[in-house]
């Protein structure tokens, strides 16, 4: 059985085609900078063949046409026609109150997904467009919606409710939902294997640090609390997102800058975070260069980011009763940036959480798992590359093979 996973971004399309029997990857790739004249297609085949092509891809529809050309390319020998693909799993950022688990795509679920898109206007609408196109391109494939919010369905009301009028929650579903759930699900299972401990016995703090970042407290193998909220804007300092702020800033800056609240929200999402503080870049690699050159704002950006992470780790240690099995760093920054890991855990050695500097310094490869805890550390500190696609694959396979 061949299953395709699709991860749609606002200007990108990430895909992996699996042969499910042994989770063999037949081809994977990304189509980046969609809607620009500098679009990039990167693919990697099962034989390790890497290709990079520059094209002008005007839309996600055109990107999907390119995907079909890649999959049916006779030289690559992946598939002969689209009907060979029996299942497609879509990563959906926001499932709102409607979707507690991954679900089969049908008329009803697509309709419900459209209704909740107002909760994620930056993410869900473009994913829906891609879904509607894939329904035409792959008419015979069963398709599945896999939600980043579903993992957090186990949070208690005291963790997910805001202290706003209760009617906002009951009437408008205003609450914390959390994100990066596909990643947290994979990491939790992986840690259970690494530590040789039942998943339901695990207490973890997982840091998904990338251009978008969040942190998850896992209690007895289930999501207990998380930093992102109603939207992915809440929580940690991110590449271009502010993370936690005083909400009164929005009407104040709207007045001072003579801009609409919607425009201020856009600034908080796209021009803030590391980019906003550093005055340089949303890319931490560029900011570290600034630190080396003694640039004040670059140093400040790194300090603010690490300080916010440290505060969240401390608070999650408290809600987990200071009883945790491991702290895990994952995603692009979490796996490669030893400096942020060191700063984020500085001081925790006093309560038995200690990094080994040499191991930490060596853990920079985005594909390699590492144990960076010192011999004295009472808590494991692990670096584990995430694999959201594998979570999508498993959920898709389980749903499309389930007896009706």
UniProtKB/Swiss-Prot annotation:
Pathway assigned in UniProt: Metabolic intermediate biosynthesis; acetyl-CoA biosynthesis; acetyl-CoA from acetate: step 1/2
Cell division recorded as keyword: no
Active-site residues, record numbering mapped to chain: 148
Pfam families attached to this UniProt entry: Acetate_kinase
Sites marked Transition state stabilizer: 180, 241
Keyword Cytoplasm applies: yes
Subunit organization: Homodimer.
Protein known as: Acetate kinase
Species this chain originates from: Borrelia turicatae (strain 91E135)
Origin organism lineage: Bacteria, Pseudomonadati, Spirochaetota, Spirochaetia, Spirochaetales
């Amino acid at each position: 059985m061949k299953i395709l996973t699709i991860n749609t971004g606002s200007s990108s399309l990430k895909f992996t085609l699996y042969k499910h029997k042994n989770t063999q990857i037949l081809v994977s790739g990304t189509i980046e900078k969609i809607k620009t004249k500098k679009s990039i297609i990167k693919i990697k085949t099962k034989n390790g063949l890497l290709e990079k092509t520059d094209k002008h891809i005007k839309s996600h529809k055109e990107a999907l046409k390119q995907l079909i050309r890649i999959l049916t390319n006779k030289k690559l020998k992946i598939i002969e026609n689209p009907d060979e693909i029996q299942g497609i799993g879509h990563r959906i950022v926001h499932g709102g109150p409607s979707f507690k688990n991954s679900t089969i795509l049908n008329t009803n679920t697509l309709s419900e997904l459209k209704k909740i898109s107002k909760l994620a206007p930056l993410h869900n609408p473009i994913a829906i467009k891609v879904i509607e196109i894939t329904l035409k391109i792959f008419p015979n494939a069963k398709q599945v919606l896999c939600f980043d919010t579903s993992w957090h369905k186990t949070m208690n009301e005291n963790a997910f409710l805001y202290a706003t009028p209760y009617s906002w929650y009951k009437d408008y579903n205003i609450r914390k939902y959390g994100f990066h759930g596909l990643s947290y699900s994979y990491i939790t299972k992986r840690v259970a294997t690494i530590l040789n401990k039942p998943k339901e016995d695990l207490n973890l703090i997982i840091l998904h640090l990338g251009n978008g970042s969040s942190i998850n407290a896992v209690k007895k193998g289930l999501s207990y609390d998380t930093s992102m909220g109603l939207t992915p804007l809440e929580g940690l300092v991110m590449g271009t997102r502010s993370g936690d702020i005083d909400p009164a800033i929005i009407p104040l800056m709207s007045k001072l800058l003579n801009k609409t609240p919607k425009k201020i929200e856009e600034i908080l999402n796209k021009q803030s975070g590391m980019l906003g503080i550093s005055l340089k870049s949303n890319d931490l690699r560029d900011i570290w260069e600034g630190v080396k050159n003694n640039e004040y704002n670059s140093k400040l950006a790194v300090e603010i980011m690490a300080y916010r992470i440290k505060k969240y780790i401390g608070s999650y240690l408290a809600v987990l009763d200071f009883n945790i099995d491991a702290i895990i760093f994952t995603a692009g920054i979490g796996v490669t940036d030893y400096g942020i890991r060191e700063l984020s855990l500085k001081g925790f050695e006093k309560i038995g959480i200690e990094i080994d500097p040499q191991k930490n310094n060596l853990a920079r490869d985005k594909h390699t798992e590492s144990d960076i805890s010192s011999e004295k550390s009472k808590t494991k500190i692990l670096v584990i590359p995430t694999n959201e696609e594998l979570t999508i694959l498993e959920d898709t396979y389980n749903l499309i093979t389930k007896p009706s």
